[in-house]
């Protein structure tokens, strides 16, 4: 039986990942910030906001999956920016300290990250060979998160970092926010509309995470995005068609930056990111085409 330890296991990605892992011979310990009782013999909850939580984590953990982090979908006040950073760094450091104090480190750590690692560009195509230093707040979060995760290599753990693109899911996240203006018939171009949206269907993301965990030759950063990113204007048009709504309005960049503040970078300052590394290992995406991905989700 394989033992998993998961942070963020009750979130959008984590909950679907847990449901998939349960299909195998496994036991899952989920770290949460509140007391929770499990009705499933394959799942245990540990409240790591309480003192002594470390002693409740099983000794023989094989796989650590670190997804914990405050949502980006809130206004980035100075106080919340600190929460965004610390929620990721402190949880990762706490995991590292836990296993550093034990004689048995996990075989593999899968640590979430984001395509915000790469600088925004209308023409550049980014693969995993591109390396950079932080250039804005979001990239600094990503850079520091990855750096703290890489400490696990000192313990002999194989470290896999998944740079998530825009996750398309019916259970929350970006797609629900994107759909909202179209439901009120005010969807359309954002800014220039030329910025890239590197997206991934939630089902492909779950399978990609498990593929990387189970592939012993996988290590380092992986771009977890569909092979065919789209520019925002075409993305919005495709979404509108799937929803049978118009795609006619325009929100200027200046207005969006004034309304959203720094959070507007998530929508306007984006990157064209390609999943070369995971494809080279043989992973096949079920949803490479945006039209098919959106129709699958919106039809449900």
From Swiss-Prot:
Pfam families from the xrefs? DUF1731 (PF08338), Epimerase (PF01370)
Similarity field: Belongs to the NAD(P)-dependent epimerase/dehydratase family. SDR39U1 subfamily.
The protein's matches in NCBIfam families, at most eight in alphabetical order, are given as: yfcH
Query: What protein does this entry describe?
Result: Epimerase family protein SAB0724c
What is the organism of origin for this protein? Staphylococcus aureus (strain bovine RF122 / ET3-1)
């Amino acid at each position: 039986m394989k033992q998993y330890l998961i942070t963020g296991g009750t979130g959008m990605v984590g909950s679907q990942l847990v449901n998939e892992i349960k299909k195998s011979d496994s036991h899952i310990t989920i770290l949460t910030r509140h007391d929770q009782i499990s009705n499933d013999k394959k799942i245990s909850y540990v409240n790591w906001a309480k003192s002594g939580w470390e002693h409740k984590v099983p000794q023989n953990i094989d796989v650590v999956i670190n997804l914990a982090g405050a949502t980006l979908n809130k206004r980035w006040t100075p106080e919340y920016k600190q929460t965004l950073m610390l929620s990721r760094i402190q949880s990762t450091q706490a995991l590292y300290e836990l296993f550093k104090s034990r004689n048995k480190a996990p075989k593999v750590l899968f640590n979430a990250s984001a395509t915000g690692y790469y600088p925004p560009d209308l023409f550049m195509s980014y693969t995993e060979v591109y390396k950079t230093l932080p250039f804005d707040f979001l990239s600094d979060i990503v850079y520091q998160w990855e750096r703290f995760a890489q400490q696990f290599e000192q313990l002999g753990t194989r470290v896999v970092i998944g740079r998530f693109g825009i996750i398309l899911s019916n259970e929350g996240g970006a797609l629900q926010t994107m759909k909202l203006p179209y439901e009120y018939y005010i969807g359309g171009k954002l800014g220039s509309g030329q910025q890239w949206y590197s997206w991934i269907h939630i089902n492909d993301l779950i399978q990609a995470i498990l593929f990387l965990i189970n592939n012993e030759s996988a290590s380092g950063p992986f771009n977890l995005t569909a092979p065919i990113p789209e520019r925002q204007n075409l993305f919005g048009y495709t979404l509108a068609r799937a929803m049978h709504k118009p795609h006619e309005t325009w929100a200027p960049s200046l207005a969006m930056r004034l309304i959203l503040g720094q959070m507007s970078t998530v929508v306007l300052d984006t990157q064209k990111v390609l999943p070369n590394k995971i494809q080279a290992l043989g992973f096949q995406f079920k949803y490479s085409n945006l039209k098919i991905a959106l129709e699958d989700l919106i039809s449900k």
